[in-house]
Amino acid sequence: MSKRKLVLSVVTAFIIVCLFGIVIIEPAEIWSRIKQNNEGMKVGYSDSVVYDGNHYKLLHPIGEKNESRYISLPDLKAITSVETAEKDEELTISYKNKKLTYDNGFIQNCSLTKDDMCGYEIIDGLIYIPDQSVERLGFQIGFFYDKQTNTVSIKSPEEQAKKPQDQELGSTIYVHKENVPAEKYEPRSGIYLGGYVLQDEYIDTSMNTFNKLTGKTHASYFKYVGYGKPFPKEWAEEVIAAGGFPQVAWEPNNGLNEVKDDEYLRQFAKDAGELNVPILLRYASEMNGTWTFYSGHSEQYIEKWKLVHDVMEKEAPNVMMLWNVFTMPESTIDEFYPGDEYVDYVGVNIYNVFYHNDKIEAKSDFEDPLRLLDYVYNTYSHKKPIVIGEFGVTNYTVTDGQHHDDFAVEKITRMYKYLPELYPRVKFIYYFDVNNLVNAPEGRKINNYAITEKKSILNAYAANVKTDQYLSKVEGDPAKSETYSYRDFFFYYGGELYADYKFVRDYLNMDVKESRGNSMKVTFNGKGIDVKQESLKIDKAAFFEKREVKGLPLGEILDAFEVENEIKDGDLHIQIAK
């Protein structure tokens, strides 16, 4: 052997010994380093986690280090039901048939190239587990909503095994009441199935063809009518001939000043009344945005709304007044509300688009159509039945020049499959069957929402509306009892369910007032209790904004006032007299 080869052999052997030494000795040294290196961990990254659709407020903040997220072991156990066992310097975390075993702070048989992922951290005496380790147990962890908000989502293996449209539905609070009066033509059980086809040239704008293709007679169709135009009697008769009743989207597009108690308004109302069938009148909708000619004038809007309501009440008692907003912005919605006595139904228009405002950087494929409904539903369904005045889903967009058929199938399936069960106060839904690439005004030719052009999308719609819960004709003689529901605006903390104080006030009919410190006083049937308030910021349904849920401990309140309740299949059911 040459001298040079001998030297290389010795050096190589030395390196091997050093590496072997690291394997045997280094973990203890790294363990010591981890204990002393907590200043490198950023704690307080987020105070919230979403797990399988439910919000959880953590007992301890989430940490972040080297692009990994760390969750405390007590919190991990609370929200995922993992089990732990400790013996000497060994810690085992298990879930179902998978387990992690830590020896002196490191997972056994872990690659040395991933030291930061293999070890856990200790902060203030608590063990913090990195997300990569939790994912070894089968969970999926990520920033909620494309990393643009500070909420972490944890999805269980069972949840991941479901189809996308069936994932993360979360829990629902149901409130069952007796002796609830119904609004005009309100179905107590079921949803009127509706659509808009007047711009679908693919089916020659035919309601009968739409009914045939979808395999279901639709109970209602709608038409846009500009204020100043006569009532569309001929079209309304076509709707009736197709087995439905009309919704008229009546829009004062020259501004609110033209709305007066004059001959035009009276004749419009008389023509509507002469039809002698239910008519859903969606007057001046989407006023909460900035894109209508009647936005930004809430006082005048309410004044004109009341005027139209009073004329309709006198001349056309068959007319249902639909006060209809757009999903967002939320902050301006309530200032336009005319009052319960002037509104029959509250509506909202919902669109699942792949990108917002034709901006490639504003990707919005994560948005859940059910969550887009939640704000209006939770705010108003305790006092008015709800209408989804328009619902559309992108299947092609010019923003990226791509077809998104799977996206459309997923969102349509999620909306129509779960709406009757989870949102019993929704009484109408209308699909917006339009290819806006052809039919929209210039500047808005962005998305194709039509469902008749592609078989997979049409089949998804047809499969989910075929149930008896979607109604094809007017229901009469509504039942006296009604089921209300409440979703999304609650969270779990320390094993307790906290619902927003507005739920306690509006849905349980309890008096809620700010009390001393961080507590609220709840009064019901002459009895009052003080309860601690816990707040949690959660993601809004769109645009990466936050909202604060001011939660009250629901179990404590129900027990204190002896309100009948039970947990069924993970949902809370409450029985309460109206």
Regions found by a protein language model. Name each.
Residues D334-S364, V387-V393, F432-V434:
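Aromatic- and acid-rich polysaccharide-binding/catalytic face
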Residues S2-I173, K473-K578:
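Primary recognition of N-terminal secretory signal peptides and signal-anchoring hydrophobic helices
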Residues L193-G195, A219-K223, P246-A249, I279-Y283, ...:
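Hydrophobic faces of well-ordered beta-strands that scaffold small-molecule active sites
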Residues F268-S298, V319-M328:
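Active-site groove signature of glycoside hydrolases
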Residues S189-G194, P278-L280, S285, V387-G389, ...:
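Substrate-binding cleft of secreted/luminal carbohydrate-active enzymes
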Residues L193-D271, K411, Y418, Y423, ...:
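N-terminal carbohydrate-binding/catalytic regions of secreted carbohydrate-active enzymes
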Residues E234-A249, Y355-T397, T452-N459:
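Glycoside hydrolase catalytic-domain groove-lining segments
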Residues E258-L280, Y301-E315, V319, E335, ...:
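An active-site-proximal structural segment forming one wall of the substrate-binding cleft
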